[in-house]
């Protein structure tokens, strides 16, 4: 899969390689499918991870390892949405707000995970080009995917927090194309957040006996 590491084009003085372009496109498709609560969200997410794993394997083992974790969480998400019993009236996953206990657990996991992963990255510099923000984005992505798999509206808030670091970080390091992709991510996140928020309120309303759902 050497072609994945070859240059696709140059934009904003940034050399875009095929794996970045394909990965970013699949990432945008994943968010759009997630907004619609489509089961295809997870196969596309898995494919995105697989493409990047193939691009990184052999010379960037740390990046390949991160994509392996993403693929594992994508399989979990597919299982949850496909086999889960908590379905909305349309047969898709039912969305809800997390409980305070769930929120606390996710915040704690994100904090501890970020510190642990950042220390790992610092101990092995070849795993990351910028340990702390890279760890924050990686762990935040995993937490967001977990919340999405459980149908939690907070999934969108987690993605927004990732974007708040990802956008300025990419622009500051000269990755304008990647930064603009994160801006598009942010727009999709706000759109999806509004939809899931309103849907969670509808799904939580009790249906009167004999009334159409």
Curated annotation (Swiss-Prot):
Q: Provide the organism lineage as a comma list.
A: Bacteria, Bacillati, Actinomycetota, Actinomycetes, Kitasatosporales
Q: Which family does it belong to?
A: Belongs to the nicotinamide ribonucleoside (NR) uptake permease (TC 4.B.1) family.
Looking at the keywords, is Phosphoprotein present? no
Q: Which residues form the signal peptide?
A: none
One Gene Ontology term of the molecular function aspect: nicotinamide riboside transmembrane transporter activity
- Name its cellular compartments: Cell membrane
Give the gene symbol: ribM
Naturally occurring in which organism (per UniProt): Streptomyces davaonensis (strain DSM 101723 / JCM 4913 / KCC S-0913 / 768)
Record-annotated membrane-spanning stretches? 15-35, 38-58, 107-129, 136-158, 171-193
- What does the UniProt record say this protein does? Transports riboflavin and roseoflavin. Can also transport FMN and FAD. May confer roseoflavin resistance to S.davawensis, which naturally produces this antibiotic during stationary growth phase.
Entry keywords, A to Z: Cell membrane, Membrane, Transmembrane, Transmembrane helix, Transport
The membrane topology term of the UniProt record is: Multi-pass membrane protein
The record's Gene Ontology cellular component field reads: plasma membrane
- Domain of life, per lineage: Bacteria
Q: Output this protein's name.
A: Riboflavin/roseoflavin transporter RibM
User: Which applications in biotech or industry are described for the protein in this UniProt record?
Assistant: Introduction of ribM into a high performance B.subtilis riboflavin production strain may improve riboflavin production process.
